Amino acid sequence: MRMDEFYTKVYDAVCEIPYGKVSTYGEIARYVGMPSYARQVGQAMKHLHPETHVPWHRVINSRGTISKRDISAGEQRQKDRLEEEGVEIYQTSLGEYKLNLPEYMWKP
């Protein structure tokens, strides 16, 4: 599968995540038939245009935390968008934003 095809499948899958729910990079990779491509799902999210309709903020890591970015404002933006959807997020002692993954997890 070419990467542009992979990205399209990833974006389509992410658009299926319901409001107020999240999924993980690995779960999206499995859903699109590329189970070892979790990091590439992250890259697909990174390449989205800022004004995209794809709900990128609903994809988190498998530990239930918002992944660190080069620009910390992105983490805050993801946290804010999830909280707007009713997802409860707390900050760990390490400064990570975390949520109760079993409560909010969406699996296709």
From Swiss-Prot:
Gene Ontology annotations for the cellular component aspect, listed alphabetically = cytosol; nucleus
Highest taxon above the source species: Eukaryota
What Pfam families would the database entry show? Answer: DNA_binding_1
Disulfide bond positions: none
Q: Where is this site: Critical for recognition of O(6)-alkylguanines, probes the electrostatic potential of the flipped base to distinguish between O(6)-alkylguanine and guanine?
A: R69
Q: Where is this site: Arg finger, required for nucleotide flipping?
A: R39
Which residues belong to the signal peptide in this entry? none
Q: Which CDD domains match?
A: ATase
Entry keywords, A to Z:
DNA damage, DNA repair, DNA-binding
Native organism is Schizosaccharomyces pombe (strain 972 / ATCC 24843) (Fission yeast)
State if DNA-binding is listed as a keyword.
Answer: yes
Point out the gene that encodes the protein.
atl1
Other known facts: Does not have alkyltransferase activity. A tryptophan residue replaces the cysteine at the known active site of MGMT.
Entry's family note: Belongs to the MGMT family. ATL subfamily.
Site positions (Required for phosphate rotation/nucleotide flipping) are Y25
- MF terms per GO, please? catalytic activity; damaged DNA binding; O6-alkylguanine-DNA binding
Q: What does this protein do?
A: Involved in DNA damage recognition. Binds DNA containing O(6)-methylguanine and larger O(6)-alkylguanine adducts. The DNA is bent, the damaged base is rotated out of the DNA duplex into a hydrophobic binding pocket (nucleotide flipping), with Arg-39 donating a hydrogen bond to the orphaned cytosine to stabilize the extrahelical DNA conformation. This structural change in DNA presents the lesion to the nucleotide excision repair (NER) pathway. The affinity for O(6)-alkylguanine adducts increases with the size of the alkyl group.
Give the protein name, as stated in the record.
Alkyltransferase-like protein 1
GO biological process terms on file: global genome nucleotide-excision repair; transcription-coupled nucleotide-excision repair
